[in-house]
Amino acid sequence: MKKHSNKALAIVIIFSLFVSTFPNISGTSYSDIQIDGNLSDWDSSDFLGQRNGAGFALTWSEDNLYFYWNGTDFYNDIEGADIFLYFSTSNSGSNLSKSWNFVEHNLPFSANYGLSIEDSNYYEFVEWNGSSWNVIESEDIELYIGWSGNKASEIKLPLSYLGNPSNISLMAWAQWQHEANVWSSFPMLNSASETGAEYFTHYYSTALEEDISSSEIQILSNSLKLDDAINLAIIFHQHQPYYSSCLA
């Protein structure tokens, strides 16, 4: 009996060492993230890219969407920024963002909801009512906003605010704090010209299910020119793993 117990213990120890040596690298969703400015509970494959010094990531649980934006001090009057997230859950939304600093951006989809964040002291969650953007109560949204000592921002958005969709399309961007000049946007195929109103063309689209990693989130376009070989080559090169999986 003791001999079998020793074998069982050895198997448990070996299995534990194997798991610790090869941690989960799939980055699948259904993650619960603590909104505290500490990114250690994020998986590396939740990461969607980095542009002009800002990193962007997305994951979700059964009840919430989670985002991080890393690399920006939102309280700096000179280098600070405002961040925007827009969401489409149906075709009955608006193709223009809510005016901010007197500028509206063209969106790549019909957006039903938007989140605009200046800093932890002020943000707006808006819903399209068919003719205009309305600010609605959003006390359950949780934020940690990056500052000079920790430039990692985290956002928790309850899915109930979006009508508990099973699929979602979204995009994000940051613009100057006191102007509407966009300096970073995601997906990264979008413009970020820092010149005012933008015409965004690309967005993320995904089912909100378990076992989906960032590499499986689709990047779609509302204005892809099929006769433009250069654009097609760029898109295929940047997203080759996704297209390869489609062809397999």
Q: What do these predicted regions represent?
A:
Residues 147-194:
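Ser/Thr/Pro-rich, low-complexity mucin-like regions
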Residues 25-32, 219-226:
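Low-complexity, acidic Ser/Thr/Pro-rich repeat tracts that form intrinsically disordered stalk/linker regions
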Residues 174-223:
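A recurrent domain-boundary module in secreted/ectodomain proteins
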Residues 73-79, 161-166:
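A short beta-turn/strand-edge loop motif at beta-sheet boundaries
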Residues 221-248:
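Carbohydrate-active enzymes and regulators
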Residues 30, 34-44, 77-151, 193-196, ...:
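Extracellular/luminal beta-rich ligand-recognition
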